[in-house]
Design a protein with these regions (language model features):
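ABC ATPase nucleotide-binding domains
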Residues: 1-65
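Residues that scaffold the ATP/ADP-binding catalytic core of kinase and kinase-like folds
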Residues: 7, 60, 68-69, 125, ...
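Beta-strand-rich soluble domains of envelope-associated proteins
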Residues: 39, 57, 72, 137-140
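Residues located in well-ordered beta-strands
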Residues: 53, 65, 79-81, 131-135
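Internal, well-ordered alpha-helical scaffold/interface segments
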Residues: 55, 64-68, 111, 120
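C-terminal boundary and immediately downstream tail of ABC-type ATPase nucleotide-binding domains
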Residues: 60-83
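Non-catalytic connector elements of ABC transporters
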Residues: 75-77, 86-202
Length: 202
């Protein structure tokens, strides 16, 4: 069960620290990978997708695959375009919060991109550029997960993707299903990916 798996991870970590030897541990469990490893090698169809520390993998994913595989819930992916200076949602609303250097690296003007946003990097903000409607609330004690869908075509809404947008909120903040909320992006915490290749725009 879950408690047994948690205890096993702790025991494996203790064993690794006590032996002080290089160990290779193969797992499909991202929590095991993040908590046990000093370095992670992410494989996709037998090919190396990314190699780095757990922080590297989580904070600077090299591709959409890595971004959505590592981390629970998976990273949100929002379609946008860029003119090389700013990110623009489908209704023309600018999306702030992504580092200017990442936007410039997205290359050609008016290029289609995917903006990756971790659920903890989306903030409730009455002036936010992303407008969504709350579908489901998961109350997890210290945290609340809000599963939302985009409101397309409205001022300040602009996200046309139909997949869920997941927002992590403090446990005491619980909007009701059906509520319309606005979100902004934590400064410099967005990621820009090429939708054709799936690679981070580097």
């Amino acid at each position: 069960d879950a408690n047994l798996r948690n205890q096993m991870r702790i025991e494996l970590r203790r064993l690794h620290q006590r032996l002080a030897t290089t160990s290779i541990y193969v797992t499909h469990d991202q929590v095991e990978a993040m908590t046990l490893a000093e370095k992670i090698l992410v494989l996709r169809a037998g090919n190396i997708e990314q190699y780095g520390t757990p922080d590297d993998i989580y904070l600077h994913p090299a591709s959409v695959f890595v971004a959505q595989f590592m981390g629970s819930p998976s990273m949100n992916m929002i379609p946008a375009t860029t003119d090389g200076e700013k990110l623009i949602l489908p209704d023309g609303t600018p999306l702030s919060g992504v580092a200017a250097s990442d936007i410039r690296l997205a290359a050609a003007p008016s290029k289609d991109v995917l903006v990756g946003l971790r659920c903890e990097d989306l903030l409730l903000d009455p002036e936010g550029s992303v407008q969504v409607t709350v579908d489901i609330i998961e109350a997890l004690g210290p945290d609340t997960l809000a599963y939302c869908h985009p409101i397309a075509g409205k001022a300040g809404g602009g996200v046309s993707d139909q997949s869920a947008i997941i927002v992590r909120l403090p446990g005491t903040r619980r909007p009701a299903p059906g509520d319309a909320i606005r979100l902004s992006v934590r400064a410099d915490h967005g990621h820009v990916f090429d939708p054709a290749s799936g690679l981070r725009c580097l």
